Amino acid sequence: MTNVPISRLRNFCIIAHIDHGKSTLADRLLQDTGTVSSRDMQEQFLDNMDLERERGITIKLQAARMNYKADDGEEYVLNLIDTPGHVDFSYEVSRSLQACEGALLVVDASQGVEAQTLANVYLALENDLEIIPVLNKVDLPGADPEKIKNEIESIIGLDTSKAISCSAKTGVGIPEILQAVVDRIPSPKDNTDQATKALIFDSYYDPYRGVIVYFRIMSGGISKKDKVLLMSSKKSYELDEIGVMAPDQVKVNSLHAGEVGYLAASIKAVADARVGDTITLVDRPAEDALPGYAEAKPMVFCGLFPTDADQYPDLRDALDKLQLSDAALKYEPETSSAMGFGFRCGFLGLLHMEIVQERLEREYDLDLIVTAPSVIYKVKMIDGEVKMIDNPATLPDPQKRETIEEPYVRMEIYAPNDYNGTLMGLCQDRRGDFIDMKYITTDRVTLIYEIPLAEVVTDFFDQMKSRTKGYASMEYHLIGYRENDLVRLDVLINSERADPLTTIVHKDNAYGVGKGLVEKLKELIPKQQFKIPLQASIGSRIIASEGISALRKDVLSKCYGGDISRKKKLLKKQAKGKKRMKSMGKVDVPQEAFMAVLKLNND
């Protein structure tokens, strides 16, 4: 199965914005090449997780090998490497691009170029990939392929004279795409005689075989008898099996340069087979690893706590297992007076955080409380020490610190220009600095802002979508740290500080956020048998307060008329009981209350 000459190999991926039809196109390619029979076909075939199908997004990388008979009568092997399209998963995209020689740039013919598409196209151009523009959804009534072609030329600078119009849904244009992959994407370089180097572009955990590693061989070859060495972890393994994804796994005896395959070697943890790492052979090792490997850095942090303290060991096991298939997830144990034992977790972004939470609840049957997300702050202490703080509750007191710096991102928003004003208003509310505004076409505009990451990780994306009826898209990247006048806002429930509700806010916004927070908590925390004071404070200064009135039994219901002193005695007795309850009572805060901090609008 693997005796295909290198000249007849093609490795490519599909670049697209969310909802532009990438997974449907991948399905159609698999079907047209006969890789998957029509009977076995299900929508979004390469999206294996239920969660991916439900949300209609691609999270984990998949790969599939297709055999295709081209117009010249030769049989070609096409390796499709599927990529995620969301900003949180750009690291996964960068790895899969490194494993390819070409890419299909899929653009919705009714919507045009979106921010995410651009970010990934630039990554592809950096990797010198051959890009084939494909206009999808041409069967839609609102499709305007010519206008979109001009847009691609003016924004990206790609020649669209050979752009292919297709409809992945109806199958129009699919044969042309397959032929273009053969004709226009170069075959891999023939480095079979060099030392073996293979790039790991994905790995997942299989409970029976250990970690399954997906790789692309850049030079040399790997056979089943070889002993392999992973260059960054310096660990060596005997191979149990190697094979190709067609798209189900098929064992083979050997693979050579240019091919994409998988291996199983009883590897215990994904941390040992890091994505982006280089595989080489123990007896003929390569001198240096492949370039461009960067460890994924978490941008957003939050606390995860089980609602039932007995589930703490289960949560730890679940996170361990999840990390086996998610190289970007970082976590460490933490405790909180209000919540007990839990974990402080780091994520690539908000979508990544939601997905991890949902997978923990769904696949491991856990009931979780998630605290508000925060970013990493750089705090300079009076004694000159610099601390990196990812948990607002651990921010040092004002008298001990000199300055606080927060991460800033450069954000590009693409939108129809009717929504210009409302988007600029949103960015200003979120402390954004206006940098530039460019008209891409007569009716589409790019807004460029520099904005604190902390303002983006809450509900910026939701707000942007709702203000523009879903038409805007954005892309951002980190540009460094800047000093700001930030304060720690604590929330006191029944005079006890609730750590998970602590946030770091700009001094000018503190009153508004504090007031909004206690008002929201008043709605969400159920009444107890005693009065609960809710307060927002900066240090020892209370800046906003609300109270939840007590539930009270009508102790006077049996007193019909009669002496007032009897009634007073009963009321006094009730008040005394409430006071005792208040000093001993614990307030249960529902999960919605913690999420309220997350969704609390800054406007």
UniProtKB/Swiss-Prot annotation:
Keyword presence, Nucleotide-binding: yes
Residues the record lists as binding GTP: D19, H20, G21, K22, S23, T24, N136, K137, V138, D139
SUPFAM superfamilies: EF-G C-terminal domain-like, P-loop containing nucleoside triphosphate hydrolases, Translation proteins
Short name of any one Pfam family annotated for the protein: GTP_EFTU_D2
Annotated PROSITE patterns: G_TR_1, G_TR_2
Entry's EC annotation: 3.6.5.n1
Reaction(s) catalysed by this chain's protein: GTP + H2O = GDP + phosphate + H(+)
InterPro entries: EF-4 (IPR006297), EFG_III/V (IPR035647), EFG_V-like (IPR000640), EFTu-like_2 (IPR004161), G_TR_CS (IPR031157), GUFP (IPR027518), LepA_C_sf (IPR038363), LepA_CTD (IPR013842)
Occurrences of domain tr-type G (ranges): 7-189
Enzyme class: hydrolase
Compartment(s) where it occurs, according to its Swiss-Prot or TrEMBL record: Cell inner membrane
Alphabetical GO biological process terms: positive regulation of translation; translation
Molecular function via GO: GTP binding; GTPase activity; ribosome binding
GO cellular component: plasma membrane
Protein family (similarity comment): Belongs to the TRAFAC class translation factor GTPase superfamily. Classic translation factor GTPase family. LepA subfamily.
Function: Required for accurate and efficient protein synthesis under certain stress conditions. May act as a fidelity factor of the translation reaction, by catalyzing a one-codon backward translocation of tRNAs on improperly translocated ribosomes. Back-translocation proceeds from a post-translocation (POST) complex to a pre-translocation (PRE) complex, thus giving elongation factor G a second chance to translocate the tRNAs correctly. Binds to ribosomes in a GTP-dependent manner.
Name of this protein: Elongation factor 4
Source organism (scientific name): Prochlorococcus marinus (strain NATL1A)
